[in-house]
């Protein structure tokens, strides 16, 4: 293990010594992420979890199988996989949702598309949902902000908190999870506040009905039926997608290919490489992954083709 700049990073080309001073590594990690625990018992538990996660990453790099991605001890290093899932992977897929069947034969044959690096678009900074299961709101707002710029040449910084607090009648549940299509329905019916008027708090609150909601461009939404249609759609706009993000906890860089199709997290598809790898905008801050993004292997990796959708704007 080595320190790479300010980041605690396990390099897959480096043999990990059994003599690593885990205690010092843990102290450095706590300093970087400003971690303080309430009592000695909690401190001991978090140290054990940190050690377990260190061993997990160590085993990943010691595996003889060649990996296409890298892992690191990031801001989630003191969370067990169960705690991580309970806090961050709370997407609520409606029982009525029609999920697309997996297509293992899909192969992308187009050119690279990257909405994060397009001169026609002012790409918004990656946001952080914090310890609130509001990924669905960030997925919806991300698609709205970027697509409104692409399609209408209008720039907004919209309020995820408006969705968290106010879209309960649309079967969303704030920090306990929700669904992107339901968020689009709410915005179509009610408009959406700007972030400056309804700032994000990372917790459930009472709906502020008196706040102005000047964003009124959503006329509905369109569900995408296949990987082929998803590949066509990303040529013209970004897409809200549902994925399995269980293996994403310690992701640092590269193309991730191993995951299930158990949909538990909402994100935004913002590009596709010429080799078919998908580029995803996440909501765990810009220090996570590749400047807040992750790349997934082409096809229906992590269930990305199961339930994509985008807002219809006007």
Curated annotation (Swiss-Prot):
Pfam families (UniProt xref): Inhibitor_I29, Peptidase_C1
GO cellular component: extracellular space; lysosome
Disulfide bridge positions per record: 132-175, 166-207, 259-302
Localisation per UniProt entry: Secreted
Record field: catalytic activity: Specificity close to that of papain. As compared to cathepsin B, cathepsin L exhibits higher activity toward protein substrates, but has little activity on Z-Arg-Arg-NHMec, and no peptidyl-dipeptidase activity
Ranges in coiled-coil conformation: none
EC number: 3.4.22.15
Active site, renumbered: 135, 265, 282
Keyword Hydrolase (UniProt): yes
Annotated Gene3D superfamilies: Cysteine proteinases
Signal peptide from the UniProt entry: 1-24
Record's keyword terms, sorted: Disulfide bond, Hydrolase, Protease, Secreted, Signal, Thiol protease, Zymogen
InterPro entries: Papain-like_cys_pep_sf, Pept_cys_AS, Peptidase_C1A, Peptidase_C1A_C, Peptidase_C1A_papain-like, Prot_inhib_I29
Residues excised as propeptide: 25-109
Transmembrane segments: none
Main localization category: secreted
Gene Ontology process terms (BP): proteolysis involved in protein catabolic process
GO terms, molecular function: cysteine-type endopeptidase activity
Assigned protein family: Belongs to the peptidase C1 family.
Free-text function comment from the UniProt entry: May be involved in extracellular digestion.
Protein name: Cathepsin L 1
Organism of provenance: Paramecium tetraurelia
Lineage: Eukaryota, Sar, Alveolata, Ciliophora, Intramacronucleata
């Amino acid at each position: 293990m080595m320190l790479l700049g300010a980041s605690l990073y396990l390099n897959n080309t480096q043999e990990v010594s059994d003599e690593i001073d885990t205690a010092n590594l843990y102290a450095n990690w706590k300093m970087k992420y400003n971690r303080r625990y309430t009592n000695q018992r909690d401190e001991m538990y978090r140290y054990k979890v940190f050690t377990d996660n260190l061993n997990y990453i160590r085993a990943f790099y010691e595996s003889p199988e060649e990996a296409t991605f890298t892992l690191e001890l990031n801001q989630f290093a003191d969370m067990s996989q169960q705690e991580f899932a309970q806090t961050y992977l709370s997407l609520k897929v409606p029982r009525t949702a029609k999920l697309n069947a997996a297509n293992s034969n899909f192969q992308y044959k187009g050119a690279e598309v990257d909405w994060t690096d397009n001169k026609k678009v002012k790409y918004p900074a990656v946001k952080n949902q914090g310890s609130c299961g509001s990924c669905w709101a960030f997925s919806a707002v991300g698609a709205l902000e970027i697509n409104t710029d692409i399609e209408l040449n209008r720039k907004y910084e919209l309020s995820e908190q408006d969705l968290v607090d106010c879209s309960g009648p649309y079967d969303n549940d704030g920090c306990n999870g929700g669904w992107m299509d339901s968020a689009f329905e709410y915005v179509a019916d009610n408009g959406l506040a700007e972030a400056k008027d309804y700032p994000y708090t990372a917790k459930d609150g009472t709906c502020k009905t008196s706040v102005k909601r000047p964003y009124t461009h959503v006329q509905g939404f369109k569900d995408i039926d296949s990987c082929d249609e998803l590949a066509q759609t990303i040529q013209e706009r970004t897409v809200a997608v549902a994925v399995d993000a269980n293996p994403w906890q310690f992701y640092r860089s590269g193309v991730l290919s191993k995951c299930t199709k158990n949909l538990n997290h909402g994100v935004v598809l913002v590009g596709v490489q010429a080799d078919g790898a998908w580029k995803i905008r996440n909501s765990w801050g810009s220090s996570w992954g590749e400047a807040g993004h992750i790349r997934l292997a082409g096809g229906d990796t992590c269930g990305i083709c199961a339930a994509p959708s985008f807002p219809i704007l006007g």
